[in-house]
Amino acid sequence: MLVKTYCAAVNGLEVTTVTVEVSLNTGVMYHLTGLGDEAVKESRNRIAAAMQYSGYKFPIADITINLAPANLRKEGSSFDLPLAIGILGANGNIPEDHLKEYMMVGELSLDGTLQPIKGALPIAIKARSEHYKGLIVPEQNAREAAVVNNLEVYGMKKLFDVIQFLGDKSSPTPTIVDTRKEFYENQVHCDYDYADVKGQENVKRALEVAAAGGHNLIMVGPPGSGKSMMAKRLPSILPPLTLSESLETTQIHSIAGKLGKNVSLIAQRPFRAPHHTISQVALVGGGTSPQPGEISLAHNGVLFCDELPEFNKTTLEVLRQPLEDRHINISRAKYAIDYPCSFMFVASMNPCPCGYYGDPTHHCVCTPGQIQRYMNKISGPLLDRIDIQCEISPVPFKDISKAAPGEPSARIRERVIRAREIQAERFKDFKGIHCNAQMTERMIHQFAEPTEEGINLLRMAMEKLSLSARAYNRILKVARTIADLAGSQQIEPQHLAEAIGYRTLDRGDWAERGHF
């Protein structure tokens, strides 16, 4: 007897429907075909034990199972449930009637308990697009999958519960989630606020410009000047996620198994801050069983690298292509995966090995050669991709002792949102372009063309600072954002002057300046 059940294989954000074909004949052999990995091959023992604890015997027969399409690699234990149901169906324990109506995924414990799986949300989206009536998942994944509308999602605790449901012996209620309500209720404000930051108005301004245009930013300053503190407050001034951005971000975290307990939608922009000892694979993704890296987990949010020169130089260099293309293609012998990674890159660093170069209150013990070698840990091509380079001075006592709080994040966020609305209108006819940082060269010529006076100012800056062509484009993008914040359609010389001031690390005299 031949029975078919349906499940899914996740490859990056791409989901493929997998048909589980089970045939029982006379004999005692067990054959599993279809490029399953070790976890799939080991499923036989889990399924046999789960059946026994559920009150069913594993059939003594020649069992042949094929996972179609056979040329697609299947990985993980989420195939346990469809395999078990297929075997039970072929053995006559479950009627075939409903099997074609449902997609199902889940790992089985030896006692028949369904364990949570990764990627429930993208699988649910695939099930809806393939017009399945419903999706059967472990109970812990039900709310995550139920975010997808027009699909019945059933969260099950045990294999026995699934058997009863498919055999019309029980009528469980599908899990229902009001997606929009869930999304807006979870849009809580950030715990940090720029009102807590005393002084550093120039840095707050740089962060505001970065948030308004989606620009990458690096802060350079001595220890204790507030670099990390201000970076952690950046999400408080970013525009809120849209529902489509939330779904895309949640899918990535779902695939990585990083969704928190009872979290069905990520409604806040991610803020990822990996340690400087992170490996290349952990940063960009991949591995034996491919997983999204930190750059993809930061998609639609912020990737913050504190103490940037302490990162391995080869690890930092792999950021160059993702920063430019906003997606990462990982190609290995057994797979090729593409993950989105459109994030704001924010970094901080000390100005020298001891940390006090240019600090008027501390003596720097580093030689010019040591300082230059330290700065050279950040390559020119990587710096070119950072739109805003901001120097931070220590906060003087008179600013620290002020009783009055700084400008609150809510007020800064209002200006950022207004600037983003201008950009949304500007790029409404351009697919995949949402902010000034994403402009192509053609768009720069169309939307960020300076005046004649501005061109002369740029020419002087290019010659004096020896800026690259990429830095030239970055200046125009930042100037366009500054003009948007000012509500100006035309990029004025003062907007360009401020943008040029954010290219401080492009200057070759860092080790000779002696001050910020």
Give, region by region, the residue ranges found by the protein language model.
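Conserved inter-motif catalytic segment of the P-loop NTP-binding fold
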Residues: 245-279, 286-287, 393, 434-442, ...
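Walker B catalytic acidic pair
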Residues: 300, 306-307, 318
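Walker A/P-loop
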Residues: 219-260
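Conserved alpha-helical scaffold flanking the Walker A/P-loop in AAA+ ATPase domains
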Residues: 208, 265, 269-270, 280-303, ...
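Short beta-strand elements
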Residues: 18-24, 283, 387-390
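Peripheral, non-AAA+ core regions of ATP-driven protein-machinery
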Residues: 1-218, 222-228, 331, 471-472, ...
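The Walker A (P-loop) glycine that initiates the GxxxxGKT/S ATP-binding motif of P-loop NTPases
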Residues: 221, 285, 307
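Basic, amphipathic alpha-helical bundle interface domains used for macromolecular binding and assembly
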Residues: 33-44, 59, 66-76, 290, ...
